[in-house]
Amino acid sequence: MYQSLAMAANHGPPPGAYEAGGPGAFMHGAGAASSPVYVPTPRVPSSVLGLSYLQGGGAGSASGGASGGSSGGAASGAGPGTQQGSPGWSQAGADGAAYTPPPVSPRFSFPGTTGSLAAAAAAAAAREAAAYSSGGGAAGAGLAGREQYGRAGFAGSYSSPYPAYMADVGASWAAAAAASAGPFDSPVLHSLPGRANPAARHPNLDMFDDFSEGRECVNCGAMSTPLWRRDGTGHYLCNACGLYHKMNGINRPLIKPQRRLSASRRVGLSCANCQTTTTTLWRRNAEGEPVCNACGLYMKLHGVPRPLAMRKEGIQTRKRKPKNLNKSKTPAAPSGSESLPPASGASSNSSNATTSSSEEMRPIKTEPGLSSHYGHSSSVSQTFSVSAMSGHGPSIHPVLSALKLSPQGYASPVSQSPQTSSKQDSWNSLVLADSHGDIITA
């Protein structure tokens, strides 16, 4: 039954690594010699007692290990001068010397006195005598094997030569921490850098809980917003109200600004000046009242309100001139009202000759007031040469043959109208008659 345990015992820790606290560890009865279980000695080696950092806690550790084991016959069969307890209790040795271990850990305590070491040795001897006198047999050996191997399995995971002492101390610390606080709530765990207080929440996380619960803006009553904000009192604001409050320091006004009305929404709109309801463009005056385009533009240009007498029922549009007006206009033949009837046959022949060439002549438009600037002496009279026309024949240009410049002015019996020159004679383009100021085109 204990063959597997016996094989594990051969590879276990050295005898000094076991603790002498188990009641079955000190049972050496009749069946103990035949049992394959190894029972270590509970005596503390002299090398251990000579260590300075264990002198103050040696007795406390030994007695504490006895109390940390099973509460069997060894606990009831302890010596008369030994009091079992935890490392934090005061113990009395066989010689009556009082010993009070440190409250935290015997390993890090100050070196003890010589009396405390003697008390520890006496307590160990008393426990050994009690264990040998408690009797036993095969059952006691089996119990010792179970207890010893159970403790060996627990202590074998440590690399320190005395793990059982510190294990009991650590167990007492864990029990004290569990009694004082809840599980996983010790100050050691809270001191870790990776662990934060769950109650402390980042303030910016509130802005990301948009859809976690039904929120409403306390200013405008909005239920949804891209970003929830808070005012100075902690109330929720939508992004628009919160940003407005942050920039201006006041609450965002609930009245929305009036949007520009479309044509369908301007049915009941009328001009504040002329009370018209139809206009191409609505304007506003200095007081902010709507005015029509005519009244608004008149006020802008003249600085005074538009008179009501200028009001028209229809909308006056701009009269634009066609761009191809000069191209479409063709010079027509001169009418009879513009030319005077000739007084002689020579003038009639010349008028007929010049009429045929009127398509090549351009009419000159002048103002009537220009006639006063030209006197009788400065006027250039032109005569017609009939012989020139008859001598040269039709081969000569009719305009050149019909005009003959005379350097001296003379009084003609018949008042002849001045003739317009050809395109080559630009200096003779303006000639005015004495009788009237109209432009005559031959």
Swiss-Prot record:
Modified residues (N6-methyllysine): K300
UniProt feature, compositional bias: Polar residues: 413-428
Localisation per UniProt entry: Nucleus
Effect annotated for changing G221R: In TACHD; impairs the ability to bind and transactivate the promoter of AMH gene; abolishes interaction with ZFPM2
Top-level taxon of origin: Eukaryota
GO molecular function, a single term: DNA binding
Region (Disordered): 60-107, 314-378, 409-428
UniProt PTM: Methylation at Lys-300 attenuates transcriptional activity.
Keywords: Activator, Atrial septal defect, Cardiomyopathy, Disease variant, DNA-binding, Metal-binding, Methylation, Nucleus, Repeat, Transcription, Transcription regulation, Zinc, Zinc-finger
Biological process terms in GO annotation: aortic valve morphogenesis; atrial septum morphogenesis; atrial septum primum morphogenesis; atrial septum secundum morphogenesis; atrioventricular canal development; atrioventricular node development; atrioventricular valve formation; cardiac muscle tissue regeneration
UniProt subunit comment: Interacts with ZNF260. Interacts with the homeobox domain of NKX2-5 through its C-terminal zinc finger. Also interacts with JARID2 which represses its ability to activate transcription of ANF. Interacts (via the second Zn finger) with NFATC4. Interacts with LMCD1. Forms a complex made of CDK9, CCNT1/cyclin-T1, EP300 and GATA4 that stimulates hypertrophy in cardiomyocytes. Interacts with NR5A1, ZFPM2 and TBX5. Interacts with TBX18. Interacts with GLYR1; the interaction is required for a synergistic activation of GATA4 target genes transcription.
Annotated disorder: Atrial septal defect 2: A congenital heart malformation characterized by incomplete closure of the wall between the atria resulting in blood flow from the left to the right atria. Patients show other heart abnormalities including ventricular and atrioventricular septal defects, pulmonary valve thickening or insufficiency of the cardiac valves. The disease is not associated with defects in the cardiac conduction system or non-cardiac abnormalities. Ventricular septal defect 1: A common form of congenital cardiovascular anomaly that may occur alone or in combination with other cardiac malformations. It can affect any portion of the ventricular septum, resulting in abnormal communications between the two lower chambers of the heart. Classification is based on location of the communication, such as perimembranous, inlet, outlet (infundibular), central muscular, marginal muscular, or apical muscular defect.
Protein name from the UniProt record: Transcription factor GATA-4
Species this protein is from: Homo sapiens (Human)
